[in-house]
Amino acid sequence: MRAISFLLFLLTTTVLWGQQPLSQAQATAFKEKVMAKNKTIKTMQTAFTQRKHLEFMSNDIETKGKMFFSAPYRLNWQYTTPYQYQIVFQKDQIKVNDAGKVSQMKADNKIFKKINSLIVSTVSGNMFDQKEFAVTLYNEGKDTKAQLQPKDKTLLKYIKEIHLFFSSDASVDRVKLIEPTDDYTEITFTHKQFNTPIDDSVFAL
């Protein structure tokens, strides 16, 4: 249960004022641009800042770290500040390093598989070919925002909406995951590097 809670924390109200929906032609062109970008991504590494907003708390919870992704499914989230925590996805296995204590589990149940797939898709921005979301696209300043609503009842228990913010190069700059309670988790990526070599040891715990 702790691992599931952590994954939801990792992943985890919409006011549309000032947002301009993309036309059908614009939306199609944007999706094609993102899909083309995704096909070129073999690896990605980035720093991130994660902000967790809870309604009952006066201040948001902020954590920082690094993320490493190697297509198609290897992913390492490293929290470095204010605590040390790693979670590594490798196909159907998940490994967790909690301040030096390593544990392992199989991602063979329904919720783990969905969350695993969701995390990888969110990082890469490859959400448009999934049948589990209703997608609406907006212009928001210099960014393009994809607003996704889960269709799956299992995911809806944990996630109300997902907002992906794409930069001009069609990569994800920011992710906002809104829970049914309207609490949310927002992750901002900085210093992104694409297709630079990542040693296999990064995905080994």
Task: Please state what every model-predicted region is.
Residues M1-S5:
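Positively charged n-region of N-terminal signal peptides that target proteins for export
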Residues G18-T49, H53-N59, A204-L205:
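N-terminal leader/targeting segments and the immediate start of mature chains
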Residues Q20, K66-S117, T185:
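An acidic-aromatic
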Residues F48, L75-Y79, I94-N97, A146-L148, ...:
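Short hydrophobic/aromatic-rich beta-strand segments that constitute the beta-sheet cores
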Residues Q104-D143:
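Flexible, surface-exposed loop/linker segments and immediately adjacent secondary-structure boundaries
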Residues F128-A134, N139-L205:
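Gly/Pro-enriched, hydrophobic low-complexity segments
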